[in-house]
Swiss-Prot record:
Interacts with SIX6. Interacts with EYA2. Residues 396-412 have a biased composition (Low complexity). It comes from Mus musculus. This is Dachshund homolog 2. PANTHER family: DACHSHUND, DACHSHUND HOMOLOG 2. Residues 76-162 are annotated as: DACHbox-N. Expressed in embryo, and at lower levels in the newborn. One of its GO terms (cellular component) is nucleus. CDD domains: DHD_Dac. Keywords: Coiled coil, Developmental protein, DNA-binding, Nucleus, Repressor, Transcription, Transcription regulation. Residues 171-194, 244-286, 378-416 are annotated as: Disordered. Belongs to the DACH/dachshund family. The DACHbox-N domain forms a structure containing a DNA binding motif similar to that of the forkhead/winged helix domain. Pfam families: Ski_Sno_DHD. The gene is Dach2.
């Protein structure tokens, strides 16, 4: 599947019903929320190697990828308000990617994508759901974020209606807030007092060049922190300029504010300029952006071209794909790092490109450099590349190009006629003077005259500026660059952060293991305590049962003892009675003896009834003997 690139559509043709000053065909500055863009020529050369169904960046599938209708899967790059957006042709209608245009045009107007869907329902607009192949293509191009598996398409007319509705709603909110602020009624302060000021195309002051860089502009506008950082940067820049102008005389040509804005950097991505690879490039010198691994051709004054090896290497590293957001000023646009590992991979790619650039510069002969202007080795990627070893001499009209953009206007060619390059093997610099002929001058580095300026986020480019007596910087001295050493420091910082994260992760794992071990030990101890408690409960139950048994036995013993005591008392009473009877019997025997002794015959006694008494006495004696035997046996 080949992605065709239609001709560039002018911004006026697609901006009907939209305020004219809101969008620019070539804006002076591009915020990180705005994705970089590819020119049609670059897209054609980019897709030439992938015509046979190869995968672009792991995202664009070939024509044999399971879709019967290849026309609906043909992605086109169209111009929408001066920005290249992805579109598909379905049923004769041109449909553009809704999440992409939301990030580009609607993100600063509404609260989120859910608000857009609510407005679409209210406006009776139904977007078209993308197929799997279309989502894969958009994800490969970077129109949608990695990991997104669904997307919707919308027509141009519906988008213009939606944009007009969002703009009107925002104006109403602003008017309501102004009325609330001006009114004397107490209430809640406005929600976005320091948020979005005006449209991003009209945010930047044109009187002070280089005040704001795109790394400081958030996708939703300029925040208070960004403004403070910009003012701090501008103050440091002005101090450095005053110091450098005091050490030497100024020998440059004054530039216009537009030229200064074009040379201060951070304005546009390398995809913004369609003139880089246009046929007009061969007619005269054009200060375009080249890849880090390239040098200018000796006999041509046009833009440098790409050889297939370097182009394939850069394309495999995803360094010139469009539509990628920039989540942080120091991290590249081409790959939004969802993790530290992704950022580290990107830094490794940048280091590889830096090595390639150094090798290409070392092996390039000096005789070929004398015949033409030596091009700066600035990468075409909008990301801060480590190969920006461009040195600036104050005595010549040097151009100060940032790592993200270079303006190709003719007025810039008038002010920048000399190009310089630094040789990495020694500490000398070669300056080619185009106006005075093919003469090469050597200047030794003077470390005493270097003016370092510390910038909070990145190293100052003033560390690489070499001064000589009687020389001064160009008036349009740009904002800070990011050189190889600053990128190495960033890489070191990211490596340290990754190490800290790894240590923190290891500590968290160790703590989690310790917690799990403690939980296991506590669980085992709890089981032991439960077992001991159950054993004690069993023993207590047995003891209670034995106690109840003993109590029952004790009651029985007490009852038996009571019965025995009662029987003993009864027997003691009987014994006393028997003893009394025996005493009475003994007393009766003594009376009989006295009668015998007195001479009374036994017959009278028997006649008087004494035999009956004697029989009773004998029975009592027998009873006493029986009771005595029972007591003895007991």
């Amino acid at each position: 599947m080949a992605v065709s690139a239609p001709p560039v559509i002018s911004a006026t043709s697609s901006s009907a019903g939209v305020p004219g000053g809101l969008f620019r065909a070539e804006p002076l500055y591009s915020s990180p929320g705005e994705p970089p863009r590819l020119t049609p020529n670059m897209i054609n050369s980019f897709m030439a190697n992938n015509h046979n169904g190869s995968v672009l960046g792991g995202g664009i599938g070939g024509g044999s990828g399971g879709s019967s209708n290849t026309n609906t899967n043909e992605c086109r790059m169209v111009d929408m308000h001066g920005v290249k957006v992805a579109s598909f042709l379905m049923d004769g209608q041109e449909l553009i990617c809704l999440p992409q245009v939301f990030d580009l045009f609607l993100k600063h107007l509404v609260g989120g994508l859910h608000t857009v869907y609510t407005k679409l329902k209210r406006l009776d607009i139904s977007p078209v759901v993308c197929t799997v192949e279309q989502v894969r293509i958009l994800r490969g191009l970077g129109a949608i974020q990695p990991g997104v598996n669904r997307c919707k398409l919308i027509t141009r007319k519906d988008f213009e209606t939606l944009f007009t509705d969002c703009t009107n709603a925002r104006r109403k909110r602003q008017m309501t807030r102004k009325q609330a602020v001006n009114s004397s009624r107490p209430g809640r302060p406005p929600k976005r007092s320091l948020g979005v000021l005006q449209d991003n195309a009209r945010l930047l002051p044109h009187a002070v060049p280089g005040l704001l860089s795109p790394g400081l502009i958030t996708p939703t506008g300029i925040t208070a922190a960004a403004m403070a950082e910009a003012m701090k940067l501008q103050k440091m820049k002005l101090m450095a300029m005053n110091t450098l102008q005091g050490n030497g005389s100024q020998n440059g040509t004054e530039s216009e504010p537009d030229d200064l804005n074009s040379t201060t950097g951070g304005s546009e991505s390398s995809w913004d300029k369609d003139k880089i690879q246009s046929p007009l490039a061969a007619s005269g010198p054009q200060h375009g952006i080249a890849h880090a691994a390239l040098a200018g051709q000796p006999g041509l004054g046009g833009a440098p071209t790409l050889n297939p090896l370097q182009q394939n290497h850069l394309l495999s590293n995803r360094l010139d794909l469009p539509f990628m957001m920039m989540p942080h000023p120091l991290l590249p646009v081409s790959l939004p790092p969802a993790s530290v590992a992704m950022a580290m991979n990107q830094m490794n790619h940048l280091n590889t490109i830096a090595n390639m650039a150094a090798a290409a510069q070392i092996h390039s002969p000096l005789s070929r450099a004398g015949a033409s202007v030596i091009k700066e080795r600035i990468p075409e990627s909008p990301s801060p590349a480590p190969s920006l070893e461009e040195s600036h001499r104050p005595g010549s009209q040097t151009s100060s190009h940032p790592s993200s953009s270079v303006s190709s206007s003719p007025s810039q060619m008038d002010h920048h006629s000399e190009r310089m390059v630094m040789m990495p093997n020694n500490r000398e610099e070669l300056i080619v003077d185009q106006d005075n002929g093919q003469s090469i001058k050597k200047f030794q580095r003077d470390n005493k005259e270097e003016v370092p300026a510390q910038i909070p986020v990145m190293k100052s480019p003033l560390d690489k500026i070499q001064l000589a007596p009687g020389q001064a910087l160009h008036p349009g001295f740009p904002g800070p660059f990011i050189f190889a050493d600053s990128l190495s420091s960033v890489e070191t910082l990211l490596t340290n952060i990754q190490g800290l994260l790894k240590v923190a992760l290891d500590n968290a794992r160790i703590q989690e293991k310790q917690i799990q071990q403690e939980k296991k030990e506590l669980r085992i101890e709890l089981f032991r305590e439960r077992e001991i408690r159950e054993n004690l409960e069993r023993q207590l139950a047995v003891e209670l049962q034995s106690r109840s048994t003993m109590q029952k036995r004790l009651k029985k013993e007490k009852k038996a003892k009571r019965k025995l005591q009662e029987a003993l008392e009864f027997e003691s009473k009987r014994r006393e009675q028997v003893e009394q009877a025996l005493k009475q019997a003994t007393s009766g025997d003594s009376g009989l003896r006295m009668l015998k002794d007195s001479g009374i015959p036994d017959i009278e006694i028997e006649n008087s009834g004494t035999p009956h008494d004697s029989a009773a006495m004998q029975g009592g004696n027998y009873y006493c003997l029986a009771m005595a035997q029972q007591l003895c046996s007991a």
